[in-house]
């Protein structure tokens, strides 16, 4: 099933505009859709007690680029209690470019929002001052409207840049307005800047490529072992499906 034919392209899914912007902009850079195994590309399921079963939909969509992107994938979830857009670009390791990471999660009582250029090396080895200044300026503008969430633990924070947008909003009308306006604007600014940098980057030497491979593998292994979405996914789709999704699709190249 094409992602365009699913509920995730319809206005009643909270993140539909974000997903459309991703798909359209990656196509402008001649990215090619990557075939996802059918059991992960679209899934309908139910969760909850026998007396109050709820429907949940999941779709996984991905692309590659012959030179620049190993794998870029979006995971979309829709249900009465949860609405999720998780997106990750894993760049080719011949370029010294961080990951692009999005995690927008609507829970029963709150929205958790993360947007960043996520490092695969130490910050000083992957970001020049110009990029950091641009990111921090965009971040500060976003957080002039969106509250900054509590400080991340050191173990988690090492996988984020100084430009990370990290917010927690209550489920209320004001939050819907902030998501549809300020967050959407910031999301477009971050993605546009990221793709510009990725597609203008020059190839690096073999030693640095090895460091980038190790850095990416460290992050992907950390996510496989510690993915915070695991409990939610397990409650919606069961443990067996969740483990195979995480290990075979979400954090692999």
Swiss-Prot record:
According to its UniProt record, which reaction does this protein catalyse? Answer: (3Z)-phycoerythrobilin + oxidized 2[4Fe-4S]-[ferredoxin] = 15,16-dihydrobiliverdin + reduced 2[4Fe-4S]-[ferredoxin] + 2 H(+)
Q: Which GO terms describe its molecular function?
A: cobalt ion binding; phycoerythrobilin:ferredoxin oxidoreductase activity
Q: Which domain of life is it from?
A: Bacteria
Known EC number:
1.3.7.3
Any idea which UniProt keywords this protein has?
Answer: Oxidoreductase
What's a BP term from Gene Ontology annotated to this protein? Answer: phytochromobilin biosynthetic process
Cysteine-cysteine disulfides: none
Which regions form coiled coils?
none
Role of this protein: Catalyzes the two-electron reduction of the C2 and C3(1) diene system of 15,16-dihydrobiliverdin.
The family assignment reads: Belongs to the HY2 family.
Q: Which PANTHER family match?
A: PHYTOCHROMOBILIN:FERREDOXIN OXIDOREDUCTASE, CHLOROPLASTIC
Q: What is this protein called?
A: Phycoerythrobilin:ferredoxin oxidoreductase
Q: Which organism is it from?
A: Prochlorococcus marinus (strain MIT 9312)
């Amino acid at each position: 099933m094409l992602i365009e034919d699913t509920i995730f392209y319809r206005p009643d899914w909270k993140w539909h505009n974000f997903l459309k912007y991703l798909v359209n902009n990656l196509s402008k850079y001649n990215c090619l859709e990557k075939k996802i195994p059918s059991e992960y590309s679209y899934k309908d399921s139910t969760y909850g007690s026998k007396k109050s079963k709820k429907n949940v939909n999941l779709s996984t969509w991905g692309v590659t680029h012959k030179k620049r992107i190993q794998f870029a994938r979006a995971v979309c979830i829709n249900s009465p209690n949860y609405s999720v857009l998780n997106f990750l670009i894993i760049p080719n390791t011949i370029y010294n470019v961080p990951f692009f990471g999005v995690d927008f999660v609507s829970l029963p009582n709150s929205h958790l929002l993360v947007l960043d250029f996520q490092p695969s090396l130490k910050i000083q080895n992957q970001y020049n001052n110009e990029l950091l200044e641009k990111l921090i300026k965009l971040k500060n503008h976003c957080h002039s409207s969106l509250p900054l969430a509590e400080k991340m633990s050191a173990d988690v924070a090492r996988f984020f840049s100084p430009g990370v947008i990290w917010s927690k909003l209550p489920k209320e009308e004001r939050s819907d307005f902030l998501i549809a306006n300020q967050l959407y604007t910031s999301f477009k600014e971050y993605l546009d800047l990221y793709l510009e940098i990725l597609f203008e980057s020059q190839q690096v030497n073999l030693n640095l490529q090895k460091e980038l491979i190790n850095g990416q593998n460290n992050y992907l292994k950390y996510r496989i072992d510690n993915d915070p979405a695991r409990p939610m996914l397990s409650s919606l789709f069961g443990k067996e499906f969740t483990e195979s999704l995480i290990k075979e699709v979400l954090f692999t190249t």
